[in-house]
Amino acid sequence: MEESPIRFADVDINEILKTLPHRYPFLLIDRVKNIRADYSGIGVKNVSIGEPCFQGHFPERPVYPGVLMIEGMAQTAGVIGIKSVEGTEKPRAVYFLTIDKCKFRKPVLPGQTIEYHMRSIGRRKTMWWFHGDAKVDGTIVAEADVGAMLTD
């Protein structure tokens, strides 16, 4: 199957800050790449030991929290959704609504890079659904279906 054409090659942190309302410490993606015409793309998160979550999760054996990976998936989906409708609609916000079929497969450690491979699995008006695979070095570490609503 041929891949859908790329609409946006790279959305850097400055563009993400213009697109999403999230800010440190809850902005959980560093960039989004390869946003395609089929509403798919890849969010990138560089996991650093300096992040606040590692003060308590877990000091002796730091592991990046799974719930933050799910939020990273949702933020990636939000950027894909907003960028995909840019020019035809002007949503002001994205609201994370649902999580389904969530599985955590392997721990993510400081120093690793997570790629959130997100693809649309449905859309109805302002509602979007995405399937996401979080990967480290090509290995799936978590997966989930997430739903969101774009508002104007």
From Swiss-Prot:
Molecular function (GO) terms for this protein are: (3R)-hydroxyacyl-[acyl-carrier-protein] dehydratase activity
Which BP terms does GO give this entry? fatty acid biosynthetic process; lipid A biosynthetic process
- What are the EC numbers? 4.2.1.59
The membrane-spanning stretches of this chain are none
Q: Which PANTHER family match?
A: 3-HYDROXYACYL-[ACYL-CARRIER-PROTEIN] DEHYDRATASE
Q: Which NCBIfam families match?
A: fabZ (TIGR01750), PRK00006.1 (NF000582)
- Put simply, this protein is called 3-hydroxyacyl-[acyl-carrier-protein] dehydratase FabZ
Q: Which gene encodes it?
A: fabZ
